[in-house]
């Protein structure tokens, strides 16, 4: 019988991604929303701290092992912004948040020339065996690129249509989902997690 593990998200895409990796290690992933667990306030100052807060809260409320990720876009010319606030950069929630976040990013970078628009997507995954686990498994991944001047591509979400990856010569939004999953920050963090679980 597989050991249940709570994923601190309601995002079905993340549940599928994590399930694919963790199934090989005897885990059955359950979304926290399926257990009526709310998300805690993200008060950390780093991606690691926020992922740890979310995993610890899910483990505490469920009594099960837990896993969480925190991720975002880090733009050098903006001193790391949007960073921890990537999902709410424009200060709004809801269906229009992604579009508003992209508009704000373009406004904030309006005077920044080519060659100074370096950015990276960062993902940090934390896994706890129980609420008071003193040695959580931490896996980080990143994808380096730059922010272009106008949106390009129809796939993806968030900042994908503005994030140009030199590795593929296009934006994340121009990649097919299968291709993006191979090189994304989350895919790289999951690869690190997999290697740590297999160790």
Curated annotation (Swiss-Prot):
Cofactors named for this entry: Mg(2+)
Top-level division of the source organism's lineage: Bacteria
Pfam family, one: Ham1p_like
Keywords: Hydrolase, Magnesium, Metal-binding, Nucleotide metabolism, Nucleotide-binding
Enzyme Commission number(s) from the entry: 3.6.1.66
Signal peptide: none
Catalytic machinery residues: 70
Keyword Iron-sulfur applies: no
GO terms for biological process, alphabetical: nucleotide metabolic process; purine nucleoside triphosphate catabolic process
Binding site for Mg(2+): 41, 70
Cofactor detail note: Binds 1 Mg(2+) ion per subunit.
Reactions listed under catalytic activity: XTP + H2O = XMP + diphosphate + H(+); dITP + H2O = dIMP + diphosphate + H(+); ITP + H2O = IMP + diphosphate + H(+)
GO molecular function, one term: XTP diphosphatase activity
One cellular component (GO) term of this entry: cytosol
Residues that hold substrate according to the record: 9-14, 71, 157-160, 180, 185-186
UniProt cross-references to NCBIfam families, sorted A to Z: RdgB/HAM1 family non-canonical purine NTP pyrophosphatase
Quaternary structure annotation from Swiss-Prot or TrEMBL: Homodimer.
Summary of the function given for this chain in its UniProt record: Pyrophosphatase that catalyzes the hydrolysis of nucleoside triphosphates to their monophosphate derivatives, with a high preference for the non-canonical purine nucleotides XTP (xanthosine triphosphate), dITP (deoxyinosine triphosphate) and ITP. Seems to function as a house-cleaning enzyme that removes non-canonical purine nucleotides from the nucleotide pool, thus preventing their incorporation into DNA/RNA and avoiding chromosomal lesions.
The family this protein is said to belong to: Belongs to the HAM1 NTPase family.
Protein name: dITP/XTP pyrophosphatase
Lineage, top ranks: Bacteria, Pseudomonadati, Pseudomonadota, Gammaproteobacteria, Pasteurellales
């Amino acid at each position: 019988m597989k050991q249940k593990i709570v994923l601190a998200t309601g995002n079905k895409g993340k549940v599928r991604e994590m399930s694919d990796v963790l199934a090989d290690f005897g885990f059955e992933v359950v979304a926290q929303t399926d257990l009526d667990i709310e998300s805690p306030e993200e008060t950390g100052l780093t991606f690691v701290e926020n992922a740890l807060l979310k995993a610890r809260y899910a483990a505490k409320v469920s009594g099960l092992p837990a896993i969480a990720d925190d991720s975002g876009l880090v733009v050098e010319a903006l001193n790391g912004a949007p960073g921890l606030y990537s999902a709410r950069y424009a200060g709004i929630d809801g269906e229009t948040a992604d579009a508003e976040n992209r508009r704000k990013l373009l406004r904030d970078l309006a005077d920044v020339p080519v060659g100074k628009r370096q950015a990276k997507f960062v993902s940090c995954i934390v896994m706890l065996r129980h609420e008071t686990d003193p040695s959580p498994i931490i896996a980080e991944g990143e994808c380096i690129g730059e922010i272009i001047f106008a949106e390009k591509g129809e796939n993806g979400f968030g900042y994908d249509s503005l994030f140009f990856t030199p590795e593929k010569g296009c934006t994340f939004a121009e990649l097919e989902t299968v291709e993006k999953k191979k090189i994304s920050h989350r895919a790289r963090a999951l690869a690190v997690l997999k290697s740590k679980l297999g160790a």
